[in-house]
UniProtKB/Swiss-Prot annotation:
Function: One of the primary rRNA binding proteins, it binds directly to 16S rRNA where it nucleates assembly of the head domain of the 30S subunit.
Pfam families listed in its UniProt record: Ribosomal_S7 (PF00177)
PANTHER family membership: RIBOSOMAL PROTEIN S7 (PTHR11205)
Keywords: Chloroplast, Plastid, Ribonucleoprotein, Ribosomal protein, RNA-binding, rRNA-binding
UniProt keyword Chloroplast, yes or no: yes
Main subcellular location of this protein, as a coarse class: plastid
Name used for this protein in its record: Small ribosomal subunit protein uS7c
GO MF entry, a single one: structural constituent of ribosome
Protein location: Plastid, Chloroplast
CDD domains: uS7_Chloroplast
GO terms under biological process: translation
Length: 155
């Protein structure tokens, strides 16, 4: 019998303005060098930009974008008898959400534009309309999983 106590699951915190876990997850991924106030400012400015452009609740647009970016399958490399296979694996909802946030921020950083809140707001709006580089990344992953469906039994 193990002497170690069970680890309690970490509860995600809420952001101060919208009281939303998703917003806090995104802000923590924007964060660089511990400058959380700057990360919050960037994100809230991008939400204001979304509000101005779409005239909808920015949180609804954000949820739509994350929902459309969340992958159902992912490919992982498995080494079987000397050769490496890309094995498609179903992933959990939270893991998919984390990937979606990562892809959203990566593609917004690569985007050309004035500043981060401008680029992030346009990437979120594009993802909600099923356009943009982040959506392309998700479709690429799904296509790889579909083409390697034959190796699913190695999981």
């Amino acid at each position: 019998m193990s002497r170690q106590s069970t680890v309690e699951k970490k509860i995600d915190k809420f952001d101060p303005i919208y009281h939303n876990r998703l917003v806090n997850m995104i802000v923590n991924r924007i964060l660089k060098h511990g400058k959380k106030s700057l990360a919050y400012r960037i994100f809230y400015q991008s939400l204001k930009k979304i509000q101005q452009k779409t005239e909808k609740n920015p949180l609804i647009v954000l949820r739509q974008a994350i929902h459309k970016l969340t992958p159902k399958l992912i490919v992982k490399s498995r080494r079987v008898s000397g050769s490496t296979y890309q094995v498609p694996i179903e992933i959990k909802n939270k893991e998919g959400k984390i990937l979606a946030i990562r892809w959203l921020l990566e593609s917004s950083r690569k985007r050309s534009g004035r500043n981060m809140h401008f680029k992030l707001s346009y990437e979120i709006m594009d993802a909600a309309r099923e356009k943009g580089n982040a959506i392309r990344k998700k479709e690429e992953i799904h296509k790889m999983a579909e083409s390697n469906k034959a190796f699913a039994h190695y999981h």
